[in-house]
Structures are given as C-alpha cells and as structure tokens.
Curated annotation (Swiss-Prot):
Physiological role: Core subunit of the mitochondrial membrane respiratory chain NADH dehydrogenase (Complex I) which catalyzes electron transfer from NADH through the respiratory chain, using ubiquinone as an electron acceptor. Essential for the catalytic activity and assembly of complex I.
MF terms (GO), sorted A to Z: NADH dehydrogenase (ubiquinone) activity; ubiquinone binding
PANTHER family, per database record: NADH-UBIQUINONE OXIDOREDUCTASE CHAIN 4 (PTHR43507:SF20)
One record GO biological process: mitochondrial respiratory chain complex I assembly
Similarity-based family: Belongs to the complex I subunit 4 family.
Originating species: Mammuthus primigenius
Enzyme Commission number(s) of this protein: 7.1.1.2
NCBIfam families noted in UniProt: NDH_I_M
Protein name: NADH-ubiquinone oxidoreductase chain 4
Membrane-traversing stretches: 21-43, 60-80, 99-119, 147-167, 195-215, 224-244, 257-277, 284-303, 308-330, 351-371, 375-395
Pfam families in the record: Oxidored_q5_N, Proton_antipo_M
Keyword Transport: yes
GO cellular component, one term: mitochondrial inner membrane
C-alpha cells in the first residue's frame, strides 16, 4: 500500500516546487502514472500476503473502490484547469494540495484494516472536502452548503465512535479480518437495537438515505468541479463501503431492523427520480439522480446476499464514473454560458457536435442499457429484491422508467432546440475536455466487456 500512498503524498512537494507554467502538467502526468501503476492491484491471487499488513489490507471489495479513487485524481486535475485559470499561483497550488490530501485520506479509508482507523480516515475526508466547497465554490451559498455538509456528517458519525469503543471493549479487537470470527460471540450480549442504528446511521447519512439527503444537492451545486466529481464518485461510496464492512458485525440484527430502511429507500428512490423531472439546474438534477442510484445500493446491502453485494459494488463503481462524467459535461456547459440552467444551454448540438456525442453517451450509460456495467449492477439488485418480495418490482420498474425520462429530458433540453442568443459566440470544445470524457468512458467500456475485473 505504501507504493501507492507515498507517491501520492510526494505530489504535494512536486506541486509547490514546480515552476508556475508546468504545475498542472507535472501533477497531472505524475498522478496519472500512479493510477496506471496501481492497476496491478486488480489482480487478487489467493495467496494475497503482498497486500496485507497490520495497518492496511486490500480485498476484492476495497480494491475496485481504491482504484476508482486513484483513477479520479488526474481527472479532477484535468477538469479544474479552466476553473482556476484566472487565480494566482498560490491559489492553484493550494487547491492541488487540498485535492491530494483528500485523495490520501480516501486511499487510507479504503485500505484500513481496523474499524477505528477506518472511522478516523472517514472523518478526515470531511476537512479537505469542506475546504474545497467553502473556499473554491462559486456562489455565496457555498458557506451554507459547507455547514450543512459538516453538521449532517458529524451528527451522524459521533454515535458511531462511541459504539466502536464499546465493541472494542467487548470483543478486544476491531480488526476487519478478525470480525467474522469474533462476531459470533457477541450475539447474545446485544439486547438493544440502538447499537445497530448508531453503526449504520453514520454511513446512511453519507450514502445518503432519502430523508437524510438534504446536504447533498446543496454541496454538489455549490462545489467547484473537482468537489462535485469527488463527492459523486467516491464520497458517497464511502457510505456503501462502510455499510458493507460493518454489517459483518451486525449480521443477526440486520434481518430484524432493515424493514424501515428498505421501505424508505424504495420510496425515496422513486421520489428523488421524480424530483429530477422538475429540476432546471443541471448540477442539481445530477445530484438528485445520485440519491436515487444510491437508494438501490442501500437496498442491496440491507438484503445481504452474495448477488446483492456484487450488484452494490458494480453499481457503485459504474455510478461513480457516470456521475463524474455528467458533472464534467455540466461544468463544460457552465464554463461557456455561465449558467447551470438547462434551458439556457439549449441547441448546443449545432455549436459543439463532439460535446453532444459525449452527452449522448453519458446519458445512455446513465439509463443503464445493455451491455453496460450499470445494467449488470441494477439487474443483480432488482433480481435480489424481487426474490425477497415480489412487490418490489413496482417501485423498481417505476424508477427505471423515470430515470429514462429525466435523462432524456436533460439530454434534449441541453442539446436540441433553437440556440439561445448569448450562446452563439462560445468557445469550441478543447482536447483537454475530450481527453477527460474519454478517460471516464474507457473504464466503463472495459468493465462492460469484462465485469469479472471487479466482481
């Protein structure tokens, strides 16, 4: 793991010591080199001692999420260049440093061996994310969004710390590799369901569960492009990863406690998809669609079958890349017309035909057609939920229908129709942007052709 963590940390002195005109090129190239060298981690042989240490370990669950995190760093740097082009050199280097610190804390979260270390790094990700939102956001409302993000996350997470300390005293260890063997001895000791709630709620807020999701649209809308990308692609997946890890401990209790959360997720999935139909703001629409997709992941994790876990992992990876790509496309529109309102971006297909192709591909993948990895994830989850209860097919089917409707609505509103007057003298699409979209699409294409890479 140090082969990944140390080179990532060394990007910070690289950013500060590089000459001003080379800072973006050097950091992007070196971070891309790190992401390429980390791909060998996907090969997980049975004798996996190379990826084990007392502090860090990798398995088939954490590796895909870890590689997604590392892959996204150069993409965030490529996407942010235009946003910071008018800023001072100090601002640019501070921004890059904040992103790299966030990256390191995310890598350590996904690789943590101990639940306490996982909790500490889980909370550490909050600080750089909030700095990115409140310092480099566009509107004044970013301060409000930052405080929402901070308080929702902290209020959800603090009971988890107390519970983990209690479990540590009861079991004597919080090592993730020991938990399956230790958990059997504590079933009779847990007479209350509050422990289950405190353990799960921190991750439910991060997912977010419908009803606890109000921080997400605010944070997405006010964050700069790198903030939106990392929020959608990775920070939401921290909640899913934490739930997958901690349900090993809570196994017998989950089957008694999951009904309200399953109902809320099924209802919230349809509701947030319906909210998307009423959105005029591009970033807000993509943010609400993230809540809808993550509700599917919550359902999968609660049902606790091998198929549902595979579906949850596939959908998390697929959604991470798809939503990040959609945010990049929304940002490319915003940089040209200086508005996130969809109706003001109408008719861009005639002005930016290549960008319209990226919009079409991203919209299609968001709708999960065959043979994409999105469809594989959704099919696994829908099949599992149908075997749990036949009635779930109605909200699931309705969600698929509404998802198609709002995605097509977003696509046609921004690309078709008569071009608005202020959009006629816009800049053409840059090679930087086309490279960015290609780097989002390549992993999706690879995973669609061979899902066994992560499943």
């Amino acid at each position: 793991m140090l082969k990944t963590i140390l080179p990532t940390i060394m990007l910070i002195p690289l950013a500060w010591l590089t000459s001003n005109n080379m800072v973006w090129i050097n950091t992007t190239l070196y971070s891309f080199a790190i992401s390429l060298t980390s791909l060998h981690l996907l090969h997980q042989p049975l004798d996996n001692s190379l990826n084990l240490s007392p502090e860090f370990f990798l398995d088939s669950l954490s590796t895909p999420l870890l590689i997604l995190t590392i892959w996204l760093l150069p993409l965030m740097l490529i996407a942010s260049q235009s946003h910071l082009s008018s800023g001072s050199t100090f601002q640019k280097k501070s921004y890059i440093t904040t992103i790299i610190l966030l990256q390191v804390s995310l890598i350590m979260t996904f690789a943590a061996t101990d639940l306490i270390l996982l909790y500490i790094m889980f909370e550490t990700t909050l600080i750089p994310t909030m700095i990115i939102i409140t310092r480099w956001g566009n509107q004044l409302e970013r301060l409000n969004a930052g405080s929402y993000f901070l308080f929702y996350t902290l209020v959800g997470s603090l009971p988890l710390l107390v519970t983990l300390m209690l479990i540590q005293n009861t079991l004597g260890s919080l090592n993730l590799m020991m938990l399956p063997y230790l958990a059997k001895s504590i079933n009779n000791l847990w007479s209350t369901n509050m422990l289950w709630l405190t353990c799960i709620m921190a991750f439910m807020v991060k997912m977010p569960l419908y009803g606890l999701h109000l921080w997400l649209p605010k944070a997405h809308v006010e964050a700069p492009i790198a903030g939106s990308m990392v929020l959608a692609a990775i920070l939401l997946k921290l909640g899913g990863y934490g739930m997958l890890r901690i349900t090993i401990l809570l196994d017998p209790l989950t089957t008694h406690m999951y009904y309200p959360f399953l109902m809320l997720s099924l209802w919230g999935m349809v509701m947030t998809s319906s909210i998307c139909l009423r959105q005029t703001d591009m970033k807000s629409l993509i943010a609400y669609s993230s809540v809808s997709h993550m509700a599917l992941v919550i359902i999968a994790i609660m049902l606790q079958t091998p198929w549902s876990f595979m579906g949850a992992l596939a959908l998390m990876i697929a959604h991470g890349l798809t939503s990040s790509m959609l945010f990049c496309l929304a940002n490319s529109n915003y940089e040209r017309i200086h508005s996130r309102t969809m109706i003001l971006a109408r008719g861009l297909q005639t002005l930016l035909p290549l960008m319209a192709t990226w919009w079409l591909l991203a919209s299609l993948i968001n709708m999960a057609p065959p043979p994409t990895i999105n469809l594989i994830g959704e099919l696994l989850i829908i099949t599992t939920s149908f075997s749990w209860s036949n009635l779930t097919i109605f909200p699931m089917g309705l969600n698929v229908l509404i998802t198609t409707m709002y995605t097509l609505h977003m696509m046609t509103t921004t690309q078709r129709g008569k071009t608005s007057h202020h959009a006629k003298s816009i800049k053409p699409s840059f090679t930087r942007e086309n490279t960015l979209m290609t780097l989002h699409l390549l992993p999706l294409l690879l995973l669609s052709l061979n899902p066994n890479i992560i499943l």
